[in-house]
Structures are given as C-alpha cells and as structure tokens.
Amino acid sequence: MQKITVPTWAEINLDNLRFNLNNIKNLLEEDIKICGVIKADAYGHGAVEVAKLLEKEKVDYLAVARTAEGIELRQNGITLPILNLGYTPDEAFEDSIKNKITMTVYSLETAQKINEIAKSLGEKACVHVKIDSGMTRSEEHTSELQS
C-alpha cells in the first residue's frame, strides 16, 4: 500500500499574536496576571521569538516544560519569571537555580534537595508546589502537608 503524505506547516504572525494578547488583556481586570505557555518551542512557532514579543508586551510570566527550554530563553536575554511546568530531574536543579527558573516540586523530599543545593550555591530557589487535589496526577497529597 502506498503511503500518501501531506506536508503540514504552521505559521505565526507575531502582529496577530500581539493583537490577540492585547484583546485578552482588555477583557481582564488590571490586577490579573498572564502567563505565556511556550513549551515545545512555543508549539513549534519559535519560543525565543514568541518570548521576546510576550516580554515586550508585558506578560507577567512564561512557562516551559523542560529546564533546557528555560535555559534557552535565558541565554537569549529573556528576563521574565519562567516556570517549568514539567518534572525537573535532580541533575537539573543547579542549572534551574542558577538560571532563576521556577521548578515544579512534587514532593517534600524534592523540595529539601533543592533547598540544600540552593544553600550551597548561596542562592534562593524558586519552586511551585504541585499538590494532588484529587486527580492523582502528582505524588504530594494534601493530607501529607502541614499548615
């Protein structure tokens, strides 16, 4: 059987992105924060280019799926806060801390490891605590946390 392939592509017009972002901002209260999720190379549209536009348009945060994506943004001059939505392996803790990438933490043990590495670097680590609120998508459960 002959396999027929159809070439596919995606194009992004940064002016349209800017227009859409500003329309969204106009619908929101002034104190609402916006996080531009640009994981997977901004879904194939070029993370650095999209991040530069979002930074210029004053979004509040950026989110990626891997440490390497956040480091690439830092290496290209992006200064916005960056949240890594994905799992950060132990060997990426130091790079995340040095590049001021907020790590998603799934367990108390991981938070403690990150804290020790940050102390040894003389830095503060930024973390985002993921809590299983009933969908069983993470290790940490609300019943295990102390107030």
Named regions from a protein language model:
Residues I4, T8-E11, N16-F19, E29-S143:
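Active-site-proximal beta-alpha core segment in soluble small-molecule metabolic enzymes
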